Amino acid sequence: MILERTIGKAGTVAVGEFTPDGKLVAYKSNEAFSNDLAMMASQFAATVRMFLTTMAASFSHLTGLPLVPYQGFIFSGGDMSSVIRQDHWAIVRTAQSEFTPRGGAAERGLEELARLPGVRLAAYYASEIGEIECKQSMSLSPEVRATATEIVASTTSALRGLATAFEHLSTTRWTPVKGWLYAGGDWVIGVSPCCWLLAHSGEAETNELHRAVMR
């Protein structure tokens, strides 16, 4: 069973199974983690999955790249990280987990990010002004990149709001946003508040990409 396999991973606080409409099926924890909180985590997981599926469908329509169906999501903020797969969620303490950035990862520049396995586009951006600089080995036009960057920035803002809400429910620190990653279709999007990557899932290593964008 997936819960038994994942509860033993380093840094794991709790893992759970949920239905598409956000109902808790089962959960296990390594720390004090109430049933009510597990129910809320399941509601958040279903909400995030539906929201990201909508975002990815829009991104696919814009770029012509298949980013659906949804495959998985990683979020890191404050002291915590979460993973949401098809019908399972996990909550971990980032510093004790595989998502901890390795030495120098947070200092990677745009050229180095663009050379990561599978990466086709790496860009710096600011939510107020859009794209600042971009390196790509694909042919997305400046207009398409501008809209894609706006989608990425607005998604980050929405996830920040959800993280703030869960922070108050769980009494653990989920903000500021450090990075998030979406995998769907044939592609992976990795995002921090200042940069984002687009990588082909057949070549990319998702945990490495997530660590690379974390700030």
Model-derived regions: residue spans:
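Non-catalytic interaction/Regulatory regions outside core domains
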Residues: M1-R215
